[in-house]
Amino acid sequence: MKQKIHLWIEEYLFFPKFFQKIISFLLLPLTLIYLIIIFTKRFKAKKIDFDIPIISIGNIIVGGSGKTPITIELASKYENACVILRGYGRSSKGLQIVSLNGDIKVDVTVSGDEAMLLAKSLKKATIIVSENRIEAILKAKELGSKIIFLDDGFSKYSISKFDILLKPKNEPTNNFCLPSGGYREPKSFYKKANIVLQEGKDFKRVITIKKDENIKELPSYTILLTAISKPKRLLEFLPKNIKMISFPDHHNFTKEEILDIQNEYKDYAILTTGKDMVKLKEFNLENLYLMDLSIKIDENVDFSSMNSYINSFK
């Protein structure tokens, strides 16, 4: 039931059917209030310069658009890099140092799934989770970081930064902002970014199936188990006979849920994403496969403005 509700909300926000469009229009007065709040915050914000290059990687629609793999791809190119994110789905509060120069300090319950995936992928970087991005930036500088990558930082108007916005390959047919649609900020705000990268044009996802770090072929009977935003986007990379079991974004799997899935799909292998794998490892599942996602950025993408921004701090 939860899975059906989750998928219905996703459909309503991005690709609504007739009845869902009616709901969308009925909620427009609330959307207007939401927009007034957004514009007021942006107008009142006073930029703070932290004297360190800060690259924000974000999007203006609800849910995932490849921020984590793009962050990994870009941050891996720099020494003394720090990635700062809120840490959705974690049990902890406040600022937590997830990894320090590649040395992982906490477990996934403290860090959240995205932060742990970043920590495991960026072997020399520092990863910090915090609700307060300004506090985290100051901590990163204190720890000796020379460049900061800010996850989902576009709406942090008070931070002076270089903004990269990601566009989905298939843009929503519903162009309204919340709660009438899936945009967190007006679509026109793409023009306010320093660089806009669109999936399918400027970058593409590369999928590799692995088991125990080795490249493998998927068994004939496989289910996709995931707790990411917009899970249907994964299906285009997989055989059509794959069944999908999805949970809300950042969901923490329980032992009971895993046992129920194993009982229902006794002869099936389980395929999952890197973000989910950091949470599923604790269950020691024998027939667990990884849908390893990496990003290939088109060689024609122009990063000269970002390089100039970074060099201006040297």
Curated annotation (Swiss-Prot):
Q: Which domain of life is it from?
A: Bacteria
Q: Which InterPro entries match?
A: LpxK
Q: Catalysed reaction(s)?
A: a lipid A disaccharide + ATP = a lipid IVA + ADP + H(+)
Entry's EC annotation: 2.7.1.130
Residues that, per the record, bind ATP: 61-68
Known pathway: Glycolipid biosynthesis; lipid IV(A) biosynthesis; lipid IV(A) from (3R)-3-hydroxytetradecanoyl-[acyl-carrier-protein] and UDP-N-acetyl-alpha-D-glucosamine: step 6/6
Q: Name one molecular function that GO assigns to this entry.
A: tetraacyldisaccharide 4'-kinase activity
* Single GO cellular component term: plasma membrane
> What Pfam families is this protein classified in?
LpxK
Q: Which GO terms describe its biological process?
A: lipid A biosynthetic process; lipopolysaccharide core region biosynthetic process
Task: Print the keywords alphabetically.
Answer: ATP-binding, Kinase, Lipid A biosynthesis, Lipid biosynthesis, Lipid metabolism, Nucleotide-binding, Transferase
Q: What does this protein do?
A: Transfers the gamma-phosphate of ATP to the 4'-position of a tetraacyldisaccharide 1-phosphate intermediate (termed DS-1-P) to form tetraacyldisaccharide 1,4'-bis-phosphate (lipid IVA).
Q: Which family does the entry's similarity section mention?
A: Belongs to the LpxK family.
> HAMAP family, per this entry?
LpxK
| Name the record gives this protein | Tetraacyldisaccharide 4'-kinase
Species, as recorded: Aliarcobacter butzleri (strain RM4018) (Arcobacter butzleri)
Encoding gene per record? lpxK
